[in-house]
């Protein structure tokens, strides 16, 4: 039987950074609320959570890199909403933000979680920010907690 390594969902004693885009703030504020709810329900203290606001999703990877470089965080949660418009702008932003977040995570060996909604419409974004399709900010924070704990477990294995 293979060795199975899993981690729990306790945020107690862990430090979390949240980076949230202000663009489409009527969506991102709901994502932030969901993330904060997940973290506090899981035992994170208010003093263990840092919220950083950036202008838009495109700025998130640089902010995540700077946050990761401090060495103060066990996980970083990136939240934003990119909604398709009439031009190619959506495609470029989505591609670069996802690559940038992945690079920060790999370069720093740190869970940097992708909680960026990439939707075809405002309605889809609203659904994923706390209505029909749950709250992806909450889901992303739970994944961040699990990954932060997994990094600890793997460091001890």
Curated annotation (Swiss-Prot):
The active site is at 89 (proton donor). One of its GO terms (molecular function) is 6,7-dimethyl-8-ribityllumazine synthase activity. 5-amino-6-(D-ribitylamino)uracil binds at residues 23, 57-59, 81-83, 114. It is an enzyme of class 2 (transferase). The keyword Phosphoprotein does not apply. (2S)-2-hydroxy-3-oxobutyl phosphate binds at residues 86-87, 128. SUPFAM superfamilies: Lumazine synthase. It catalyses: (2S)-2-hydroxy-3-oxobutyl phosphate + 5-amino-6-(D-ribitylamino)uracil = 6,7-dimethyl-8-(1-D-ribityl)lumazine + phosphate + 2 H2O + H(+). This is 6,7-dimethyl-8-ribityllumazine synthase. It comes from Desulforapulum autotrophicum (strain ATCC 43914 / DSM 3382 / VKM B-1955 / HRM2) (Desulfobacterium autotrophicum).
């Amino acid at each position: 039987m293979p060795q199975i390594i899993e981690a729990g969902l306790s945020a107690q004693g862990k430090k979390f950074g949240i980076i949230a885009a202000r663009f489409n703030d009527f969506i991102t504020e709901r994502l932030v609320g969901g993330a904060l709810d997940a973290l506090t329900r899981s035992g994170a203290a208010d003093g263990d959570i840092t919220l950083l606001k950036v202008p838009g999703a495109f700025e998130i990877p640089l902010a995540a890199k700077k946050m990761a470089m401090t060495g103060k965080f066990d996980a970083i949660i990136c939240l934003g909403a990119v909604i398709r418009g009439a031009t190619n702008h959506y495609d470029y932003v989505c591609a670069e933000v996802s690559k940038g977040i992945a690079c920060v995570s790999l370069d720093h060996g740190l869970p940097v979680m992708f909680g960026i909604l990439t939707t075809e419409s405002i309605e889809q974004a609203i659904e994923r920010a706390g209505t029909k399709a749950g709250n992806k900010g909450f889901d992303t924070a739970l994944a961040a907690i699990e990954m932060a704990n997994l990094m600890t477990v793997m460091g001890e294995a």
